Amino acid sequence: MSIIVISGCATGIGAATRKVLEAAGHQIVGIDIRDAEVIADLSTAEGRKQAIADVLAKCSKGMDGLVLCAGLGPQTKVLGNVVSVNYFGATELMDAFLPALKKGHQPAAVVISSVASAHLAFDKNPLALALEAGEEAKARAIVEHAGEQGGNLAYAGSKNALTVAVRKRAAAWGEAGVRLNTIAPGATETPLLQAGLQDPRYGESIAKFVPPMGRRAEPSEMASVIAFLMSPAASYVHGAQIVIDGGIDAVMRPTQF
């Protein structure tokens, strides 16, 4: 039985992924603020440190997979928490867990980015540059003082920087024998999306943002792709970002890919 660690396992895509992987016979070690084997607040350095210690204690012989789903949206009240969870809550965990993954059987990791990751250019984004430099306090300050666009900046900027972080790790992880990929979901029927729809700042634009397929995704549709990426069937998929958005990115950026 393989051991797979999932952050953000209590709701949304993380919960759907847990269901699919457990049904396939995998043992799950979940991380979340509730309803998980490891209870942790990834918005703080202390919470991330404790999460890492608790997971490694449960996976002393190694782990076979890692799925990083924990994330916050643009409507989050404390915008600094968006960049802390979305970026540091993923990069610090993936780096800390690489040695354990190297001990696993056909190990693989999937990080949840977003179709919004393509909305900003990394080299022209002060937030992304601060995140890459590990300057958490500076990154939090940037979004908290960004005015009306702070939420969108925090979300898209953190996902942009996260995708770059994964791609820049592809060489080292490949040499270590651990596959690492991201998925970029579009609008998915999760509590995170519902919170956005109910926010007067974002609700109307989200509601009007309908993919060419005419509907939003279900979490299970993300989970099935994650399960594939974690499986031996994806043995040569590495360093990739898989866009699962019902065609939105193709419509918005047909010549950019």
UniProtKB/Swiss-Prot annotation:
GO annotation, cellular component aspect: cytoplasm
Catalysis performed (reactions): a 3alpha-hydroxysteroid + NADP(+) = a 3-oxosteroid + NADPH + H(+); a 3alpha-hydroxysteroid + NAD(+) = a 3-oxosteroid + NADH + H(+)
Annotated positions binding substrate: S114
Pfam families linked: adh_short, adh_short_C2
EC number: 1.1.1.50
Keywords from the UniProt entry: Cytoplasm, NAD, Nucleotide-binding, Oxidoreductase
Induction of synthesis: By steroids. Derepression of gene transcription occurs by binding of the steroid inducer molecule to a repressor protein.
Active site: Y155 (proton acceptor)
Record localization: Cytoplasm
GO MF annotation terms: androsterone dehydrogenase (B-specific) activity; nucleotide binding
Binding site for NAD(+): G8, C9, A10, T11, G12, I13, D32, D41, L42, G71, Y155, K159
Disulfide bonds: none
Record has rRNA-binding as a keyword: no
Complex and partners: Homodimer.
Family as reported in the entry's similarity comment: Belongs to the short-chain dehydrogenases/reductases (SDR) family.
Miscellaneous comment in the UniProt entry for this protein: This protein is thought to initiate prokaryotic steroid catabolism.
PANTHER family for the chain: DEHYDROGENASES, SHORT CHAIN, ESTRADIOL 17-BETA-DEHYDROGENASE 8-RELATED
Protein role: Catalyzes the reversible interconversion of hydroxy and oxo groups at position 3 of the steroid nucleus. Along with the 3 alpha-hydroxysteroid dehydrogenase and 3-oxo-reductase activities towards a variety of cis or trans fused A/B ring steroids, it also reduces several xenobiotic carbonyl compounds, including a metyrapone-based class of insecticides, to the respective alcohol metabolites. No detectable activity on testosterone, progesterone or 3-oxo-desogestrel.
Protein name: 3-alpha-hydroxysteroid dehydrogenase/carbonyl reductase
Species name: Comamonas testosteroni
Gene name of this polypeptide: hsdA
